[in-house]
Amino acid sequence: MNSTRITSCIAALLLALLAGCVVPPGSPTGLMDVAERPAEKALLAGMRAYDDGQYPQAEQSLNQALTAGLASPKDRAAAHKYLAFIFCTSGRVPACEAQFRAARGDDPAFALSKAEAGHPQWGPVYQRVQR
């Protein structure tokens, strides 16, 4: 009976020690926190400029975002994707190809949506880079 009590005490001690090792969750990062980082702020500005048809401004902001060091591989891939779109639509096909390759390099899961991949200007370039 004594060995059962010792085993129970050891088990309780181990559980107590393990409970002390649990790392409390950090506070979640919100959009407003991320939007204040220079690289992420430049990415958002570039995406807005692109959506507004301000392609030279979008190109500048997206390059600035990449230079400033976007933390997320998905964010870097998004910046490269928008740059690829800009380059393809302005006839800079080699630069477009390079941006699609860079997007895939930063995020191996990178893929255009079906609608994006079907675009007449950058769709064929994207398909060629995927081979």
Which residue ranges define each predicted feature?
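Boundary/linker segments of alpha-helical solenoid repeat arrays
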Residues: 72-76, 105-121
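Bacterial Sec signal peptide processing site at the extreme N-terminus
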Residues: 15-39
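Sec-dependent bacterial lipoprotein signal peptides
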Residues: 1-23
